[in-house]
Amino acid sequence: MLSKWIILFLIWSLPFGQDVIGEGLYEDELIGFLQENYKTSTTLGYTMARDTMYLRIDRIDGQVKGIYTNYSLTLPDGVDPSTHLYQNGSSNGINCEHVWPQSLYEGGEPIKSDMHALRPCKNNVNSARNNKPFDESTDTQTITWYWQNSQTSNIPSSNIDEYSENHESYFEPREDRKGDIARTMFYFYTMYSDIADEYFFEGQKEILKTWHAQDPIDEDEIARTWQIADYQENKPNPFILDATLVERAYFYDGILIGDLNEDGLLNILDLVMLVNIILYDEDGSPAADVNGDGAYNVLDVVMLANIILSQN
């Protein structure tokens, strides 16, 4: 009974409108559409882009926080942002993380300065991540755990989801930033696939898709991409505006997960159909298993609701 009321509450909470980018397009055709409409040819140049990110995009209440650790430094007015945050290169400083490593693409500007792919990062964590791919790290195989200003080689006894993990071969961001990282990676490869390392992307694609679903788009992420767009030809990261793009561009096999009425859209009608499948034990299509766990339950409803909400 509780599950039923949770499901009904989710439906009542949903708005009916939604924005669909490249409606009816899939795979290469959709990727081409995204490149044509969302790829910027104008950036600020790396020095100005980095300072703008620190001062105008990611300074909140006077603080700049690292993407992987939530570690923060105060950034006052009237100082050089990059110099002040860098702290002479100490481990407690903050520098600029290229979420897609610079060593894994060919070319300079405007790619290097595209703020959709840049994030503030604690100096020593940036060095630890280096150019490693993203993936899940088994706790017992994690070399170092990072959170705020602390690092440890021992499995944390509390707040474990707040830590990012450095493995010998890959890097795992903290739980509530995995979706942000995934959508950045899909953006970068989509816009710059002609020069980005294809094998680097293909090796991470599946886990990035999972993270995109598990850590859905939120209002802060939407606000940030539009702030960046103000400096880059009014072009946001489309993967933050339409949660269906990841699957439609890179995983489409004729079935759009969550599209139960097969109209090419994810909306309230699909949610109603999913609820009926769960409540009345009806046979469902593969599209109903939104979280990919092999079952139809309230978790699928929550995930589909998050996807629909993120498109509004």
Residue ranges, per PLM feature:
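N-terminal module-boundary/linker segments of secreted carbohydrate-active enzymes
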Residues: 18-74, 249
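Alpha-helical segments with a strong preference for the paired helices of cellulosomal dockerin domains
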Residues: 263-284, 293-312
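Sec-dependent N-terminal signal peptides
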Residues: 4-14
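Extracytoplasmic/secreted envelope proteins and their assembly/folding machinery
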Residues: 27, 31, 35, 119, ...
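Low-complexity, Pro/Thr/Ser/Gly/Ala-rich linker/spacer regions in secreted
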Residues: 15-20, 247-261, 311-312
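Domain-level detector of nuclease and nuclease-like folds
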Residues: 86-95, 99-254
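Extracellular-facing binding/remodeling surfaces
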Residues: 255-259, 280-289
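Short, His- and charge-rich active-site/binding loops that engage polyanionic ligands
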Residues: 71-93
